[in-house]
Structures are given as structure tokens and as C-alpha cells.
């Protein structure tokens, strides 16, 4: 039996109720809704950590963040920790990573200045890539190297690669580029790590594609958001627009897999 290709599509700070398959009334996620209908929809899924770096350390290592010393941001995943990529590599898979990593840099406290182990805006050396060997288009802290319509990641050789167009589209394009160059000799494990719909730290807002605000103004407010507090009225349409962009990009990725004859033997997992 031919071993399947595996793709993990990972979004950042995406609520479960942004998807139609979980009750979102607006047309935010038609592609993901179709995948949920045709495949498996998880009804109970939990993250061990609510913060970027720690949550990623759990997912990559299969261990609690406290076990791998990644209990807060700005703590690098130890190089002796065996990861998903290591296990897939040992099993004869190509390993590929695209997008936000957030597991390479170290500092003594979250508010302290970085020492020489700062890769927030620099290329991540191979030994800090968590075992991803064959294809790499990533930045450690994508918030620090990008905005909605500008930014960059680094390739396998450490060369800076500038975005063209909207950020989520660019990240997805790097994944599609990998699929186009894939030779089929080995099965692949591809991890796509988007930053959307994470807020833009240095701008204090959610940076959606152009036109998203107008498209998603007729939303229903989730019950857990206080009606009389916060700035959700200003930001929620853009937040949904970012989620919709991810859905469109998942659709483009699936179309590429089908065009290349890879879809029937590929498992795609979407989570946040």
C-alpha cells in the first residue's frame, strides 16, 4: 500500500466558530466546510497552550510545553527534542515547512533584550528548524517580518524572499511551489503555518485582504464577546476576512493537489 502524503494546515488565533461547519452563518469557509462534510470533523479539539510558541512546541514535539522548556514565548525548542519532522524523516518522508515557526529564538525573560540567539528577523539556521530538512520557507516571528501586504521569509539557504500580494496568499504560494517541484519519489510531510487571523502586533489591528471589511459587516457576534466592551465592532469584520482568505487558500491548495494527481493519496489536516 502506498503511504499517504500528509499536510498540516495551521492557522493562528482562529476561533472555531468562524467556520460554517461549526455554525458560522456567513460564507467565510466554503472550502473547509466541504472538506468537513467529505472527511472528518473534530467536535472536541483542545490546545494545551493558548500562546504562540508554547502551543507550537506541543504540536511539533507531542509533549507538554513545560517538558520541552517552551512554557512562554521567546524560548527555543531544544535541539535534542524529537519532532514530527524527525519521525517522518526516519520513516522515509520528505519534510517541508512554510510560514511562521516561532521556536528558534531565546531570551532570559519575555521582556528582556535578546542575546545572540535572536532569529526574529534573521534566517533560522538548519539546526533550529525542528528537523524540517527538504523544503523551508519560513520566518521565526512572522509578526516581526511582515504586515498584511508586505513582508518576507527565508528559504532553505537563508535567502530572504519577499512577499508578493497579500501575506496569506504568499505563504500559500510557497506551499504550492513545493507541490509543483515535488518529484514523487518519497511521500511528503508538509506543514503550512499561516499567521492569519492573528492581529498585527505593531499596528494594533487585524489586517485583512482589501474589501473584507465590507464583505463581512453583517456578522453575528459570538456570545462570549461582551457587547458593551472592547473594540470588536471595528475589528471583527477584518478578522472574518482573514479567516476567509485562509479558506480561499486552502481551496487553491486542494486544486493544485488535484491537478498534480496527488489529492487521492493525501491527508489534509486543518487546525489552529
Model-derived features: where do they sit?
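Formylglycine-dependent sulfatase
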Residues: 1-272
